Every structure is written in C-alpha cells, then in structure tokens.
Amino acid sequence: MARSIRKGPFIDHHLISKVEAAIESKSKKPIKTWSRRSTIVPEMIDLTIAVHNGKDHVPVFITDNMVGHKLGEFAMTRTFKGHSGDRKAKGK
C-alpha cells in the first residue's frame, strides 16, 4: 500500500539534516546512515550515502532514477553464494 500524497515522503530528521549540511559545504564525503527506511528525495541526487546492511555500510551513489525509492533497496542484506552443483557432474 502506497503512502498518502498529503503526508509526503518519509525521511529521518537526522538524515535530512546531514544531507543539507553536505549540500551547503559541497562535501563529496559519504553520509553514513542506518536509516534504510528513508525515501530518496531530489535533494540527495549526486550524493553518496553509506547505507548500513546489518554488517557494514554500503556506499550508494544517488542518481535521478532512484528518487522515490527507499535507501534500503540499494544495500543488500543477504549474500547469495550460489547453489551447490551436482557432485557427479563435477567429477566427470
């Protein structure tokens, strides 16, 4: 279910304040955040945000195609190592 338009996008206050500070200082340093639930807004374009995936911070460079999505969508939390193959086929 989508969020109501009248409410606007959800962004944590501490994250938006860090974004505004980075824009003011024109800093290219990654902004570290644990807020995977925050929506990407147009002010974040061309910034690098390091999103926590449960283990470490994954740097995500924000482009215009990402606007409207959540930060957590771009930092995978699970690593897929691949299914084990058929052992008989490997031996031949």
Curated annotation (Swiss-Prot):
Pfam families: Ribosomal_S19. One of its GO terms (molecular function) is rRNA binding. Keywords: Ribonucleoprotein, Ribosomal protein, RNA-binding, rRNA-binding. GO terms for cellular component: cytoplasm; small ribosomal subunit. The keyword Ribosomal protein applies. InterPro entries: Ribosomal_uS19, Ribosomal_uS19_bac-type, Ribosomal_uS19_CS, Ribosomal_uS19_SF. SUPFAM superfamilies: Ribosomal protein S19. PROSITE patterns: RIBOSOMAL_S19. The keyword Transmembrane does not apply. GO terms for biological process: ribosomal small subunit assembly; translation. Belongs to the universal ribosomal protein uS19 family. Protein S19 forms a complex with S13 that binds strongly to the 16S ribosomal RNA. HAMAP family: Ribosomal_uS19. This is Small ribosomal subunit protein uS19. It comes from Legionella pneumophila (strain Corby). The lineage of its organism: Bacteria, Pseudomonadati, Pseudomonadota, Gammaproteobacteria, Legionellales. The gene is rpsS.
